[in-house]
Amino acid sequence: MKQKVVSIGDINVANDLPFVLFGGMNVLESRDLAMRICEHYLTVTQKLGIPYVFKASFDKANRSSIHSYRGPGLEEGMKIFQELKQTFGVKIITDVHEPSQAQPVADVVDVIQLPAFLARQTDLVEAMAKTGAVINVKKPQFVSPGQMGNIVDKFKEGGNEKVILCDRGANFGYDNLVVDMLGFSIMKKVSGNSPVIFDVTHALQCRDPFGAPSGGRRAQVAELARAGMAVGLAGLFIEAHPDPEHAKCDGPSALPLAKLEPFLKQMKAIDDLVKGFEELDTSK
């Protein structure tokens, strides 16, 4: 079955092409740390031959606690992104939270991301669609894979079909997430075979019901990522940090930066294997 290709400059993203890595840090903590993490990702992905897009947030507007670190904000965040692009020539993905942010962010980065908690907000979707930028839509934890077709339709109505879908797990009772591996193919089907990627980092979140920051299950990142890659996906979304225990956001779910290369070697091996198989139709 023909898969839709979404191009991010010279990077082609599709479910039947070699996977693209969307990776970096959860939130911009400092200019120097962003440069360090981006350079390490680039070194590893270039060595392994993996197409790469740098990820970081300039504002974590949905933090649980009013006291949690949010990021440097729009103006300073765009300055850091511009320096990363000038220094490394890297593609960048970041999220927007308000319609007014869509165009200023799209003027700097290559992919704008629709956060899971905001994925059904029509005004935000319309503003993002108007930019003409490549869009990454995070599937809300409370939305079924089949309902993602409605969000894609909103972007199409807004004149933008350059849409990537991303799963980050579904609510499983209170304060826990699980990943339905069957959901990936459903998301492909309802979106006209748009590229589907897997955010393994945020799927590992597991909250303390009485705590402010999210907990996580970093020790299981490789096994969950291996399971997702075995489905046959367009890309993998993974955040890393040189010192996860002291990261300003989602450290318990972050991959230790030093483990990035062996982690990606496993992911590439699985991706190469799965995409070397002939398509098998078991529906009849």
From Swiss-Prot:
GO terms for molecular function: 3-deoxy-8-phosphooctulonate synthase activity. GO terms for cellular component: cytoplasm. Gene3D superfamilies: Aldolase class I. Its main location: cytoplasm. One of its GO terms (biological process) is keto-3-deoxy-D-manno-octulosonic acid biosynthetic process. It catalyses: D-arabinose 5-phosphate + phosphoenolpyruvate + H2O = 3-deoxy-alpha-D-manno-2-octulosonate-8-phosphate + phosphate. This is 2-dehydro-3-deoxyphosphooctonate aldolase. It comes from Escherichia coli O6:K15:H31 (strain 536 / UPEC). The lineage of its organism: Bacteria, Pseudomonadati, Pseudomonadota, Gammaproteobacteria, Enterobacterales. The gene is kdsA.
